[in-house]
């Protein structure tokens, strides 16, 4: 069993959302599983927020962040500051490469990046990264079949990260 969350659903009250999740998980001895930074935007900072709340609530090693896509939309210096926080929080990252690869195009101009968790930076930075799938044969991804080999292959090609020794 886990306690799951989606802070973006409580826009403007994300801290309260995370406080409730962490408190419920701590009281019940559960792990925490939170979907963060899904919109591929430099306006999102939920991964950082989750890492800080993990430390604040003493939940190190018990929290997984799913997606973390928007990290790629931030400057490298900020990303590495967040990686340091993730390590301090002993937080796990779950990348779901095909979940947002079709992110809608916008007219917003920014540094070039794709809508994939920056696994190619996280793994060498010493962050524990796993793969998952986020939508199985549903309205959003009708052809997704939960094949983790597909998820791995998409990440490999999208991030140009082929260091197999560090991926196993």
Language-model-detected regions and their locations in the chain:
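Histidine/acidic residue-rich metal-binding segments in metalloenzymes
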Residues: 1-64, 70-93, 109-131
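Short, basic, glycine/proline-bearing loop/turn elements
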Residues: 67-69, 97-106
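His/Asp/Glu-enriched, well-ordered alpha-helical/loop segment
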Residues: 52-63, 99, 103, 114-168
